[in-house]
Curated annotation (Swiss-Prot):
This is Acetaldehyde dehydrogenase 3. NAD(+) binds at residues 11-14, 161-169, 272. The active site is at 130 (acyl-thioester intermediate). The gene is lapF. It comes from the Bacteria. It catalyses: acetaldehyde + NAD(+) + CoA = acetyl-CoA + NADH + H(+). Keywords: Aromatic hydrocarbons catabolism, NAD, Oxidoreductase. The keyword NAD applies. It is an enzyme of class 1 (oxidoreductase). Its EC number is 1.2.1.10. The keyword DNA damage does not apply. One of its GO terms (biological process) is catabolic process. GO terms for molecular function: acetaldehyde dehydrogenase (acetylating) activity; NAD binding.
Length: 304
């Protein structure tokens, strides 16, 4: 079966984990890994796995996009450089999945709104953040039943799972995730908080989700909606688990989740990596299905 050929931009934790997710896909093939440090472990591992590599950033990939038929690129670099990366790749007809908090394209959470993005050709979609992918489905599960005045999420992440790129983008991480709780989750106001936990041994990713509904919670319908949504996420993130809840207190609804990874690149405590890379892979697969079926066509680049 024909596969859509992909490039991975960024050779850090997220980019390296993506290699394994995409290699398992029936629809996607990883072909290029792009970095900026010739000595990076991610580039070395990519070469071992048979990918072509460059340490010259996106500019090192551009001359090879057409000859290697790259149609989808995953950008796992930084919010600060994403817009320029995306502009250069889009100009060559490459669809970009954005794993930075840049959020220049529409925000995507697979079980909430992926199908609508795939149905129309978006050349850049943003995966928000690991915390967003872990918590927005639950907020949406509440807001589709009852209006939510306020949603607050707290993500606790093992320090060892947070690379320099994510650390440099923590402000953008908070801002983008807070906004996505509103735009995608459906809350009128959203607030996202991240705790980077240096404990040894490293702790699994944990998420606390609190919603304040306008009316008294319809506990039976809300619980059913939340459990259904947890099942949807588990289809592509098997380690996504409801630990406690939903708990009800007045108009408050609280849910406690944890996310274990598959252990592809970092150990299983790094569920924050897995939920981000799995969501991005699922998103790319949906676009790949549409491309392979001829339902959407990527633009043909103009040859100078």
């Amino acid at each position: 079966m024909k596969k859509i050929r992909c490039a991975l931009i960024g050779s850090g934790n997220i980019g390296t984990d993506l290699i394994y997710k995409i290699r398992r896909s029936a629809l996607l093939e990883p072909v290029w890994m792009v970095g900026i440090d010739p000595a990076s472990e991610g580039l070395a591992r990519a070469r071992e796995l048979g990918l072509k590599t460059t340490a010259e950033g996106v500019d090192g990939l551009l001359p090879h996009v057409q000859e290697d038929d790259i149609q989808i690129a995953f950008d796992a670099t930084s919010a600060y450089v994403h817009a320029e990366n995306s502009r250069k790749l889009n100009a060559l007809g490459v669809l970009v999945i954005d794993l930075t908090p840049a959020a220049i394209g529409p925000l995507c959470v697979p079980p909430v709104n992926l199908r609508e993005h795939a149905a129309r050709l978006e050349m850049n979609v943003n995966m928000i953040s690991c915390a967003g992918q872990a918590t927005i489905p639950v907020v949406h599960a509440v807001s589709r039943i009852q209006s939510v005045a306020y949603a607050e999420i707290v993500a606790s992440l093992a320090s060892k799972s947070i690379g320099p790129g994510t650390r440099a983008n923590l402000d953008e991480f908070t801002y983008t995730t807070s906004g996505a709780l509103e735009k995608v989750g459906g809350a009128r106001r959203g607030k996202a908080l991240a705790i980077i936990n240096p404990a040894e041994p490293p702790m699994i990713m944990r998420n606390t989700i609190s919603c304040l509904t306008d009316a008294e919670p319809d506990q039976e319908r809300l619980s059913a909606s939340i459990l259904q949504m947890v099942g949807e996420v588990q289809k592509y993130v098997p380690g996504y688990r409801l630990v406690n809840g939903p708990l009800y207190d007045g108009n408050g609804v609280s849910v406690f989740m944890e996310v274990a990874g598959l252990g592809d690149y970092l150990p299983t405590y790094a569920g924050n990596l897995d939920i981000m890379t799995a969501a991005a892979t699922r998103t790319a697969e949906m676009f790949a299905e549409e491309i392979l079926a001829g339902k959407i066509r990527l633009p043909t680049p103009e040859v100078a």
